[in-house]
């Protein structure tokens, strides 16, 4: 028997506002986002991610995003020790989809902005204008030390200065095809990129620190943030408010997209049993690595993403917001997310991506008021 969930009551004005976008955070690294010996164990492949994104497109997901990870956490599960590369993966996925928006992540310490500008323009051509770029500054020092490109620990406090110059070069090249930018980190001398993107290139960021939000307010089209807690869907609201306030200072509209993991089943009890099983198998060695790395940055303050990721409360899934319950309960909680001012969308992960997306599309999404505008499904995806 499926658990009943109370219906939210919205005014017409609220319903018009509550049209929340849904994205999938594809598993570019092994085992997705569960650091547990009890979770599904799998390697990242193009075929797996193709199946995930095609299924997401079938169920009217709005976008797909891949991260970039250059060194994992080890442990019994070898967590994130095995990763594909973001731009090449998303170029492939752009070629086998037709509607869904596609976002790759640039580890900006590893890629010159002029190269990213050209790669993005190429994937814009492949996708027919469906591509955008997520910019990350880099927080896990061993990822870059192993290649001899870590700029020193002062970078922790200057990384958004670096990113500000980086995005200015990108905007020059995408907008005019030329850059003569001169800064502390980058020097462009009649740098050229052509062809330019067919549509304005979307730039996204995932800043939760004051510096990160100030950057997003000035340069990003929207900002990712972590959900918080287990079955506390609106606990992230203060973060969304901070983002709105930062954007108001720049006169721009920059909404928040919130990261959640969905663990759903027929009943609340069945879903909770899954969650407890995953927690019981937590890979303590990999989690210790995460905690150790989070303590390396002593200069960025206490409000960065990595501080939340390593919190012992729910480190088994890096402390992203977690929605555990029946299909109706998860639908209700996602409608609550949509009710938060500034929350324009969610980025979802699943304990099992293929079955999770299908269950979401068939059993959860039809119950969501904030997705009531979607057309009916017309065909099946294998």
UniProtKB/Swiss-Prot annotation:
A Pfam family reported for this protein in Swiss-Prot or TrEMBL: Bac_luciferase
Statement: the UniProt record of this protein carries the keyword Oxidoreductase: yes
Inducers of expression: Up-regulated by the nitrogen regulatory protein C (NtrC also called GlnG) and repressed by RutR.
Keyword set includes Flavoprotein: yes
Gene Ontology biological process terms in this record: alkanesulfonate catabolic process; nitrogen utilization; uracil catabolic process
Gene Ontology molecular function: any one: alkanesulfonate monooxygenase activity
Family: Belongs to the NtaA/SnaA/DszA monooxygenase family. RutA subfamily.
Alphabetized SUPFAM superfamilies for the sequence: Bacterial luciferase-like
Disulfide bonds: none
Name assigned to this protein: Pyrimidine monooxygenase RutA
Annotated InterPro entries: Luciferase-like_dom, Luciferase-like_sf, Pyrimidine_monooxygenase_RutA, SsuD_RutA_monooxygenase
PANTHER family found in the cross-reference section: ALKANESULFONATE MONOOXYGENASE, ALKANESULFONATE MONOOXYGENASE-RELATED
Entry EC no(s): 1.14.99.46
Role: The FMN-N(5)-oxide reacts spontaneously with NADH to produce FMN. Requires the flavin reductase RutF to regenerate FMN in vivo.
Keywords: Flavoprotein, FMN, Monooxygenase, NADP, Oxidoreductase
Catalytic activity as recorded in UniProt: uracil + FMNH2 + NADH + O2 = (Z)-3-ureidoacrylate + FMN + NAD(+) + H2O + H(+); thymine + FMNH2 + NADH + O2 = (Z)-2-methylureidoacrylate + FMN + NAD(+) + H2O + H(+)
Organism: Escherichia coli O8 (strain IAI1)
Binding site for FMN: 68-69, 134, 143, 159-160, 209
Enzyme class of the recorded protein, top EC level: oxidoreductase
């Amino acid at each position: 028997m499926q658990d009943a969930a109370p219906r939210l009551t919205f005014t017409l004005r609220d319903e018009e506002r509550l049209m929340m976008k849904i994205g999938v955070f594809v598993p570019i690294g092994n085992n997705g986002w569960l650091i547990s010996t009890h979770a599904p164990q799998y390697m990242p492949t193009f075929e797996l991610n193709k199946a995930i994104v095609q299924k997401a497109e079938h169920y009217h997901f709005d976008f797909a995003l891949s991260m970039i990870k250059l060194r994992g956490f080890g442990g019994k599960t070898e967590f994130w020790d095995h990763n594909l590369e973001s731009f090449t993966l998303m170029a492939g996925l752009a070629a086998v989809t037709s509607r869904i928006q596609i976002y790759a992540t640039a580890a900006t310490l590893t890629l010159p902005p002029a190269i990213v500008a050209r790669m993005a323009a190429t994937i814009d051509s492949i996708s027919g204008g469906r591509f955008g770029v997520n910019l990350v500054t880099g927080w896990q020092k061993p990822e870059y030390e192993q290649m001899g490109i870590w700029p020193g620990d002062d970078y922790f406090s200057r990384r958004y200065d670096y990113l500000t110059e980086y995005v200015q070069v990108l905007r020059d090249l995408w907008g005019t095809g030329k850059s003569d930018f001169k800064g502390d980190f980058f020097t462009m001398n009649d740098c050229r990129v052509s062809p330019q993107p067919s549509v304005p290139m979307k730039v996204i960021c995932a800043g939760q620190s004051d510096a990160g939000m100030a950057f997003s307010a000035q340069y990003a089209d929207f900002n990712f943030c972590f959900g918080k807690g287990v079955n506390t869907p609106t606990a992230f609201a203060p973060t969304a408010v901070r983002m709105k306030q930062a954007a108001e200072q720049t006169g721009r509209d920059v909404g928040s997209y919130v990261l959640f993991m969905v663990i759903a089943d027929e009943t609340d009890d069945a879903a909770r049993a899954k969650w407890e099983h995953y927690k019981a198998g937590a890979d303590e060695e990999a989690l210790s690595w995460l905690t150790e790395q989070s303590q390396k940055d002593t200069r960025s303050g206490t409000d960065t993403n990595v501080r939340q990721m390593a919190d012992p409360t729910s480190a088994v899934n890096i402390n992203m917001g977690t929605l555990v319950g029946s299909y109706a309960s998860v639908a209700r909680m996602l409608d609550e997310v949509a009710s938060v001012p500034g929350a324009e969308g969610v980025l979802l992960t699943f304990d099992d991506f293929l079955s999770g997306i299908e269950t979401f599309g068939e059993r959860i999404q039809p119950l969501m008021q904030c997705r009531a505008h979607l057309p009916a499904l017309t065909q099946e995806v294998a």
